[in-house]
Amino acid sequence: MKIAFYAGSFDPLTNGHLDVLKGCFVLADKVVVAIGLQANKKTLFSFEERVDFITQVGKDLLGADSNRLQVLSFNNLLIEKAREVGASFLIRGLRDGTDLDYEMQMAGMNGIMAPELQTVFLPASVSGRAITSTLVRQIASMGGDVTPFVPSNIAQALHSKFQSVRGE
């Protein structure tokens, strides 16, 4: 069984992440989405909320095959968690050349520490290349429409979260 390991903070999951996730299901029998937990990183959505978002998207994508998706957390080296779950390869999404430069460095380091784990790069679609979680949060915080950038359930959650912050 081929197991893809796709790690990130997913705060929130964007349509760019969704592009990559769709590619994962083409390449692997099972996809492990690993949400990195860092004590020094403040997130907008809790771990549980992010798990719910990703799980719902998985159900929407896969229907009865949603058992092909597993969502979990990690707070150690990505390669350690990937080994723990029996991953066949690591997945990294690319938006542009800047991402490629950074991800090539990471793939090199991971390859030295875990030569059995190959890194597979999946490019975002043209429509997903400009999307970042940071920009989505900024747009939502100012009351902007984020529906072109995130799944509808996440757009609603962002709207609700920032509406309460703004006191509306």
Swiss-Prot record:
Q: Where in the cell is it found?
A: Cytoplasm
Which of this chain's residues are annotated to bind substrate? S9, K41, L78, R92
Q: Is Ribonucleoprotein one of the keywords UniProt gives this record?
A: no
Cross-referenced InterPro entries: Cyt_trans-like (IPR004821), PPAT (IPR001980), Rossmann-like_a/b/a_fold (IPR014729)
Q: Which reaction does it catalyse?
A: (R)-4'-phosphopantetheine + ATP + H(+) = 3'-dephospho-CoA + diphosphate
Instruction: State the Gene Ontology BP annotations.
Output: coenzyme A biosynthetic process
What EC number(s) would the UniProt record show? 2.7.7.3
Cofactor(s) the record lists: Mg(2+)
Q: So where does ATP get bound? A: S9, F10, H17, G93, L94, R95, E103, G128, R129, A130, I131, T132, S133, T134
Q: How does it assemble?
A: Homohexamer.
What is the name listed in the Swiss-Prot or TrEMBL entry for this protein? Answer: Phosphopantetheine adenylyltransferase
Which gene is the coding source of this polypeptide chain?
coaD
